[in-house]
């Protein structure tokens, strides 16, 4: 199994990665596959893109890719609430709050110039009838702003107090809270790059179902044609098949599901409708496993080639090495 390529980190990031890897408060637990309950798994990587000691595995029965062992509930909460998470996931040497204020302000300025996002275009193209929208993990409220501009009633829940307060300054009602704090019913509930962070998405879907009148929209970085950016904050890496299987067995039917290729991640977009008739989506497990095993070995070959090239080019000319090696996209298919 290859060592997943680690990004070039700032000194602050390196410091906090080491704090995580050597922190006795961080506990891990082994789990069975969320999708099929199998314990038969192949280890793909032993670390993530930041250097966290975190294994990523492929279920040999159904093809779901996930972290295992993964952080326990208490350790996950500690990770997100402490300074470990944000001080690694932002690249500068300044504090998280300083970097986040700069980032979110800049992002909003760009957004206001061109208020557009792929998931919103997809929802509009489906001609749905809905009025009120709830977003779980609403961050600074940009996603909800799109719906507000379209005349919809919006409400969000965001675990970060800083981000929920920022959203309010932009006229978006975002409550500082998460899944267990949701109240009321909504025509449309959206989870934009949140589902992959959950420890148990099935439990969350069962809780959310009672708050959904009609539709559920999910956007996740997926594994379709290549491996996504492997990181310890993403507990699962879904394909069209595995996402469909998990969501439909929780009382939803598929209205739309597709993906778009990106430089780093394949993005999966899916709309589901609440239904009382549960018909779990079925797919060919063996083919799924074969597909991702093939993608994995192709990826390993790319890693090997890049490392060999680096060694050779480093001896010739260090600057020439950087230019040539960057041509190879390690995360490509």
Residue ranges and their predicted role:
Residues 224-229, 263-269:
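Flexible glycine/acidic-rich beta-alpha junction loops that bind and position SAM and/or redox cofactors
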């Amino acid at each position: 199994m290859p060592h997943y390529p680690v990004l070039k980190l700032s000194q602050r990031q390196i410091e906090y990665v080491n704090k995580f890897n050597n922190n006795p408060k961080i506990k891990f637990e082994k789990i069975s596959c969320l999708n099929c309950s199998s314990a038969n798994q192949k280890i793909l990587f032993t670390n993530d893109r930041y250097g966290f000691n975190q294994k990523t595995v492929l279920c040999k029965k159904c093809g779901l890719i996930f972290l295992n062992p993964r952080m326990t509930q208490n350790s996950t909460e500690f990770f997100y609430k402490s300074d470990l998470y944000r001080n690694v996931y932002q690249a500068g040497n300044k504090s998280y709050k300083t970097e986040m204020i700069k980032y979110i302000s800049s992002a909003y300025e760009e957004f206001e110039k061109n208020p557009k996002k792929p998931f919103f275009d997809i929802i509009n193209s489906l001609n749905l009838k809905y009025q009120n929208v709830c977003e779980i993990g609403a961050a600074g409220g940009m996603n909800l702003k799109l719906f507000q501009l379209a005349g919809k009633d919006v409400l969000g829940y965001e675990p970060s107090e800083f981000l929920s307060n920022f959203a309010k300054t932009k006229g978006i009602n975002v409550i500082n809270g998460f899944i267990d704090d949701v109240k009321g019913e909504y025509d449309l509930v959206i989870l934009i790059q949140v589902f992959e962070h959950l420890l148990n998405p099935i439990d969350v879907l069962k809780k959310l179902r009672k708050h959904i009148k009609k539709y559920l929209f999910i956007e996740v970085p997926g594994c379709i044609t290549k491996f996504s950016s492997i990181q310890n904050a993403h507990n699962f890496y879904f394909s069209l098949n595995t996402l469909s299987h998990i969501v439909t067995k929780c009382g939803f039917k598929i209205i739309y599901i597709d993906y778009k290729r990106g430089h780093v991640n394949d993005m999966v977009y899916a709309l589901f409708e609440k239904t009382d008739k549960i018909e779990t989506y079925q797919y060919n497990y063996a083919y799924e496993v074969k597909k991702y095993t093939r993608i994995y070995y192709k990826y390993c070959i790319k890693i090997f080639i890049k490392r060999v090239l680096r060694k050779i080019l480093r001896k010739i000319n260090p600057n020439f090495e950087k230019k040539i090696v960057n041509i190879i996209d390690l995360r490509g298919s």
